[in-house]
């Protein structure tokens, strides 16, 4: 996801290539990043953090303690944006004493096409300028909301895991089309574009999804027949249950 963020920042002309420094222990990945974006690269986290004003922590959760042990003492003068799954503001503060300007972010995979949804939770030490900077960074790859940190598990269950639910829904819609005689490629395009267009209509119209649904469902028509089948299958309850299950699992993993 850090690559997607870098790409979004550069595409949006929010910074220049020489203003980004990516670190990675694997030389081949550094070479690829340099070739792809023209940014500074290296394997020394300390050098990069010493140079930076904003640090994005984008490592696997199990690697975070080692990374913070290496650079924790240098983080007290920078704005820290963490996209490390499950790592709380408190845990980062405890592993990097003196660091207070911390933002916890939960982006999702559509950031790779700059249509992501990111939730931000701000540490107590963040200024209004820090909050504005954090929003700008993640708006480069989609939309942004601010939440209390206690709601991050629910964010994980909804927008974090949500793309997978939607992928499965698109697959099921396409399979339904194929079952009714449509060619596979055509069915997948119809399904994916329908989901994309419906989502855009919700966002841009500002209307409740139920109102938009009712406009499509004519009395005795095809759409209401399909909706009736979804109700019989427990469609809404199943989706709500998926969000609940993923939220609870996120809570378990965070303990």
Regions of interest found by a model, annotated:
Residues 1-43, 50-51, 178-180:
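NAD(P)+-binding Rossmann beta1-loop-alpha1 motif at the extreme N-terminus of oxidoreductases
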Residues 20, 30, 48, 183-190, ...:
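Small-residue helix-packing motif on alpha-helices
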Residues 21, 27, 37, 45-120:
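Rossmann-like NAD(P)(H) cofactor-binding subdomain of soluble oxidoreductases
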Residues 40-45, 145-147:
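Short acidic-hydrophobic, aromatic-tinged amphipathic segments that line or gate anion-handling sites
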Residues 91-101, 117-154, 167-204, 249:
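Internal alpha-helical scaffold of NAD(P)-dependent oxidoreductase catalytic cores
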Residues 103, 152-157, 209-214:
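Short pre-catalytic strand/loop immediately N-terminal to key active-site residues, enriched for Gly-Thr
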Residues 192-255:
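NAD(P)-dependent Rossmann-like dehydrogenase/reductase catalytic/cofactor-binding core
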């Amino acid at each position: 996801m850090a690559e997607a963020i870098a790409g979004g920042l550069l595409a949006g002309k929010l910074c220049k290539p020489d203003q980004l420094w990516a670190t990675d222990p694997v030389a081949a990945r550094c070479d690829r990043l340099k070739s792809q974006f023209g940014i500074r690269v290296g394997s020394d986290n300390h050098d990069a953090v010493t140079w930076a004003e904003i640090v994005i922590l984008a490592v696997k959760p199990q690697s975070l303690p080692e990374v913070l042990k290496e650079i924790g003492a240098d983080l007290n003068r920078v704005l820290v944006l963490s996209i490390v799954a499950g790592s709380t503001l408190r845990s980062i503060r405890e592993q990097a004493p003196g660091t207070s300007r911390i933002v916890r972010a939960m982006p999702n995979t559509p950031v790779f096409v700059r249509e992501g949804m990111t939730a931000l939770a701000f540490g107590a030490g963040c200024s209004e300028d820090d909050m504005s900077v954090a929003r700008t960074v993640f708006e480069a790859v989609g939309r942004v909301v601010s939440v209390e940190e206690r709601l991050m598990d629910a964010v994980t269950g909804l927008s974090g895991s949500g793309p997978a639910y939607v992928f499965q829904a698109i697959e099921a819609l396409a399979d339904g089309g194929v079952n009714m005689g449509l060619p596979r490629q055509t069915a997948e395009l119809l399904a994916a574009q329908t989901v994309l267009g419906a989502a855009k209509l919700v966002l841009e119209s500002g209307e409740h999804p139920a109102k938009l649904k009712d406009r499509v469902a004519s009395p005795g028509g095809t759409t209401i027949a399909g909706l009736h089948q979804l109700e019989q299958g427990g469609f809404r309850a199943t989706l709500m249950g998926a969000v609940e299950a993923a939220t609870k699992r996120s809570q378990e993993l965070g303990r």
